[in-house]
Design a protein with these regions (language model features):
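Conserved catalytic cores of very large enzyme subunits
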Residues: 1-76, 97-100, 104-176
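Conserved phosphate/anionic-ligand binding catalytic regions in large, soluble enzymes, centered on
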Residues: 5, 74-91
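Short, hydrophobic beta-strand segments
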Residues: 12, 89-94
Length: 176
């Protein structure tokens, strides 16, 4: 198979802040942002299709396997991925929400969106806990700019979100 095409990472604490601030259920916003990821990755795919099939800028990707005759690179065999970062900090923010949330149900909700996308277009959608330290730092800066008391890890100068789905042992929140 071809592998992962692209992924977009959701800033879970920022979504949580928005939910608390606007008194909107967190899952309503999470679903909304998952749909934005869907639309974004579908748009990116359409642009790559143009590069491959209309502009022929990467013809080497269209070479055929000598045994099967199928293209070595096939956009239909790629995985399209919803990434997430800051589950720990999102749970801290959501302690002030009107509803109760836990980490497991948030990840299950992301998975539910993924399954819906799989059925919608037949492509291979997945969910990953984004492993990008630079994203964890950038998201923390964004969150602190908009919400000065937003929970982060590290120091004021070198802040970051807890990577992916990790929750520190010292956190009183529970993943389940």
């Amino acid at each position: 198979n071809t592998g992962n095409f692209m992924y977009s990472t959701l800033n879970l604490p920022l979504i949580a802040h928005q939910a608390v601030e606007e008194h909107v259920p967190f899952y309503t916003l999470l679903d909304h942002y998952c749909n934005i990821v869907y639309d974004t990755l579908k748009f990116r795919r359409s642009e790559v299709e143009k590069v491959l099939y209309e502009y022929h800028m990467s013809d080497f990707l269209l070479q055929k396997d000598k045994d099967t005759g199928k293209p070595l690179y096939d956009l239909d065999r790629c995985t399209y991925t919803i990434g997430f970062c800051g589950l720990n900090e999102a749970l801290i923010v959501l302690e002030d929400a009107d509803d109760d949330y836990d980490g497991e149900s948030i990840v299950k909700r992301l998975n539910m969106n993924k399954e819906m996308f799989n059925r919608r277009d037949g492509l291979r959608w997945s969910v990953i806990a984004s492993p990008a330290e630079s994203t964890a730092h950038r998201f923390a800066l964004i969150n602190r700019k908009k919400y000065p008391n937003s929970p982060v890890q590290g120091t004021k100068k070198n802040c970051y979100l807890t990577n992916s789905s990790h929750i520190p042992v010292s956190n009183p929140s529970t993943i389940v």
